[in-house]
Amino acid sequence: MAAKEIKFGRTAREKMLRGVDILADAVKVTLGPKGRNVIIDKSFGAPRITKDGVSVAKEIELEDKFENMGAQMVREVASKTNDIAGDGTTTATVLAQAIVREGAKAVAAGMNPMDLKRGIDLAVAEVVKDLQAKAKKINTSEEVAQVGTISANGERQVGLDIAEAMQKVGNEGVITVEEAKTAETELEVVEGMQFDRGYLSPYFVTNPEKMIADLEDVFILLHEKKLSNLQSMLPVLEAVVQTGKPLLIIAEDVEGEALATLVVNKLRGGLKIAAVKAPGFGDRRKAMLEDIAILTGGTVISEDLGIKLESVTLDMLGRAKKVSISKENTTIVDGSGAKSDIEGRVAQIKAQIEETTSDYDREKLQERLAKLAGGVAVIRVGGSTEVEVKEKKDRIDDALNATRAAVQEGIVPGGGVALLRSSVKISAKGVNDDQEAGINIVRRALQAPARQIAENAGDEASIVVGKILDKDQDNYGYNAQTGEYGDMIGMGIIDPVKVVRTALQDAASVASLLITTEAMIAELPKKDAPAMPGGMGGMGGMDMM
């Protein structure tokens, strides 16, 4: 085991705080409508220009191991917020930095870290309740477009595209963002289906950067049972290889020798292939396999129907234009099933929804209906250069996630105003002075996002925050895009409650861990072994005794 270096108390916290500051300072410049760009060097290709907080955070790795631990903890805040809410990563980073800074000062002044944490938790719980009470529900397509526009850094067309996509496939429908072949950004709704099963082995991945497997013009084998060896499948595998097209296997499971053989064939390049587990369980799995069969024009290979794997021919396989498989989901786009068959299946599911008395069954049937009838909306992102397309795609992904979050939990005034207003409404009381200090830390930290937005726009943060708080109106705030004060919701500047809430909860959670840290352990750098001494010269002719 390698030797370790250990730092305690104040020394540890100072190192950690330095790491937090380096990462947060790089991320927070992207906040708000006048957020600046960050350029990220790539080992190959053009550098990447982005305003996406989580993309910046993911690139940061520091040389000093103790500083790096602090930076990685805050990076965790950004990714966790991104995973849950899909947006708000920069806000979460700014809040985490503010809470850690104030908390570290309080601990250095001799306060009890555990009481500070209790105070922080009390204040955060109250702010979350306040945000949920103030939330305004999203009802119209125009409101959806407004949320999308804000999250895409004020790009109105993006907001309109997202609103239209949600209108076409429903709020819970599947919307994907792809790179276009042209300079224009366009919206296309494609018949498709998504289910929550990912690839069985990461070796099936075709795009290592995003860790997804994309298969174009693909055959789909639907099998009801487990596959543990491929002997019985050889005839159909050989037939697929002859066509030169990829194959997706959807079965109860693919294990052992069968999975190993598929992986080896994929790696050797003989067979473009991927395997996923069938969605659902028991009878529902059978029904969902039937749904996929109807959507793709294939047949479920089932012993109930007397079909054996050995006798499967190409015409029994389903077909689709594209299948995209991530770690968690599989999306089948543009299956070649007959429209009349799909409509018949939809009518059948609707009839079952009418008849069922169980709420759970009804919910699952409605999910199946959405998958069959809803389709997949694809927003194709265009631009004149590859760098521009990538940057735009990041923003549209953020905007889409924010819009979904807004539909789920409602909206509050944007621009950091909701948190700013909550800061003066915190009435929680701690049982001692240290808990009170924890509550005050959150009060001050809640002003950080609004201050940062003003700073990024080149304005004096203290004046902006003072003016907003002087007016006793919940929606009154500062539009950094135009430099005007007024009703934020009226100006279309809004934040989804889910995004603001998640950002605050994640930031407080990680910041509390950092404040209550008393020791840090890291591996010492390995010392280079001393080089072997060179032989003595001029002794070639000596006789050995």
Swiss-Prot record:
EC number in record: 5.6.1.7
An individual GO BP term: protein refolding
Alphabetized SUPFAM superfamilies for the sequence: GroEL apical domain-like, GroEL equatorial domain-like, GroEL-intermediate domain like
Keywords associated with the record: ATP-binding, Chaperone, Cytoplasm, Isomerase, Nucleotide-binding
Pfam hit, one: Cpn60_TCP1
Record localization: Cytoplasm
GO cellular component: cytoplasm
PROSITE patterns, sorted: CHAPERONINS_CPN60 (PS00296)
One Gene Ontology molecular-function label: ATP-dependent protein folding chaperone
Residues at which ATP binds: T30, L31, G32, P33, K51, D87, G88, T89, T90, T91, G415, D495
Record's catalysed reaction(s): ATP + H2O + a folded polypeptide = ADP + phosphate + an unfolded polypeptide
Function: Together with its co-chaperonin GroES, plays an essential role in assisting protein folding. The GroEL-GroES system forms a nano-cage that allows encapsulation of the non-native substrate proteins and provides a physical environment optimized to promote and accelerate protein folding.
Similarity comment: family membership: Belongs to the chaperonin (HSP60) family.
PANTHER family registered for this protein in UniProt: 60 KDA HEAT SHOCK PROTEIN, MITOCHONDRIAL (PTHR45633)
Subunit structure: Forms a cylinder of 14 subunits composed of two heptameric rings stacked back-to-back. Interacts with the co-chaperonin GroES.
NCBIfam families xrefs: GroEL, PRK00013.1, PRK12849.1, PRK12850.1, PRK12851.1
This protein's name: Chaperonin GroEL 1
Species this protein is from: Rhizobium etli (strain ATCC 51251 / DSM 11541 / JCM 21823 / NBRC 15573 / CFN 42)
